[in-house]
Amino acid sequence: MSEMTPREIVHELDRHIIGQQDAKRAVSIALRNRWRRMQLEPELRQEVTPKNILMIGPTGVGKTEIARRLAKLANAPFIKVEATKFTEVGYVGKEVETIIRDLADIAVKMTKENEMKKVKFRAEEAAEERILDVLLPPPEDAWGNKEDVEDRGTRQAFRKKLRQGDLDDKEIEIDVALPQVGVEIMAPPGMEEMTNQLQGMFQNLSGSQKKKKKLKIKEALKLLIEEEAARLVNQEDLKEKAIESVEQHGIVFVDEIDKICKREGNNSGDVSREGVQRDLLPLVEGSTVSTKHGMVKTDHILFIASGAFQMSKPSDLIPELQGRLPIRVELSALKVGDFKRILTEPNASLTQQYIALMKTEGVDIRFDDSGIQRIAEAAWQVNERTENIGARRLHTVLERLMEDISFDASEKSGESFVIDADYVNNHLETLVDNEDLSRFIL
């Protein structure tokens, strides 16, 4: 779980996302509150529920990007889902409870990786011993029994060579555990326990089979370390820790929530829209979901919802769900200045990406300040005249601008190009000024 302060979280988000300080502050406080809650006494901790967030703003202003970056910073089970992928219980499609099941799977994977890191040193030692046993097999007596004769000097010499990598390319034959045969059983929701028992039965029938494999020592060592680490990790403890991690630190980001609102003037009983909201409500309020790893309580899972709300308003959400999203954050539409900053300031900005890509062909690209200003203006103009798709318009404009250089780059190795205002005007002016063309091409 992340122990970063709100200021540190905002600073980290600033490296990738331009502007939108209100949204950054809201998610950073919510993330820090997860840590604060864990410092409380157990009795009080149970009473402190997360303050869920609703992010409102036009498309392409950074809502989804904030979620993506937050996932990396959270160091906790995190899942991003699209609200439009789900349908009401009883209809064909995914049910909202699969969100928690997928989150539990993510937590198990994260916990397994952490637990395997803890036993890595012991696993490495055990893997080394197995390889040394293959390289220096103990002598056998007349009856084929292995004699316990220790030659410490030779073993230590081989161990040293193994650790230095001198034996990496030598081929050996080892016994490797075969992956257990996974039998996928499609069962109705709520019958996960039965499914697990059947899967466990099939896995036990297949048993832990081994197969001889001829591998280079470097590859064999990697395989054996994983095998030994998996053997040292207690699977039951792992599941318990994973479920606790989901319940106490889990974060769910629900994108496109405005698409499941009941639109104004539409009085038809739209099943898939309002029904999904009603199914989502118990998860946000707090309920218990059955997963293949065990029962998961959702009382303390943080939910962050986002939507453009162009065809609907937040008030079109059902009242109970509105009440469960108390923190509202509005993200502002992007201006020319924002576009200019997006092109230059973030880590691995779009201009840096194009410079690096062309460098692989030996072509040197430089973006002049006047060129960047003109690209930003062109993107903003097209957004204003046609559909406003926010920062995503920059991808379209830049791809069109760089098309000629990208196509001829392999024949122009060693050449240099400066992208200034004149270059941008020559390549984009007719497209930007002609509304019909920009509608179809930009």
Curated annotation (Swiss-Prot):
Keywords linked to the UniProt accession: ATP-binding, Chaperone, Cytoplasm, Nucleotide-binding
Compartments reported by the entry: Cytoplasm
Residues that bind ATP: 18, 60-65, 255, 320, 392
Example of a GO MF term: ATP hydrolysis activity
Domain of life: Bacteria
GO BP annotation list: protein unfolding; proteolysis involved in protein catabolic process
Main location: cytoplasm
Cellular-component GO terms for this entry: HslUV protease complex
Record's keyword annotation contains RNA-binding: no
Coiled coil: none
Function: ATPase subunit of a proteasome-like degradation complex; this subunit has chaperone activity. The binding of ATP and its subsequent hydrolysis by HslU are essential for unfolding of protein substrates subsequently hydrolyzed by HslV. HslU recognizes the N-terminal part of its protein substrates and unfolds these before they are guided to HslV for hydrolysis.
PANTHER family, A to Z: ATP-DEPENDENT CLP PROTEASE ATP-BINDING SUBUNIT CLPX-LIKE, MITOCHONDRIAL-RELATED, ATP-DEPENDENT PROTEASE ATPASE SUBUNIT HSLU
Subunit structure: A double ring-shaped homohexamer of HslV is capped on each side by a ring-shaped HslU homohexamer. The assembly of the HslU/HslV complex is dependent on binding of ATP.
Protein name, per record: ATP-dependent protease ATPase subunit HslU
Species the sequence originates in: Alteromonas mediterranea (strain DSM 17117 / CIP 110805 / LMG 28347 / Deep ecotype)
Lineage: Bacteria, Pseudomonadati, Pseudomonadota, Gammaproteobacteria, Alteromonadales
Gene that produces this protein: hslU
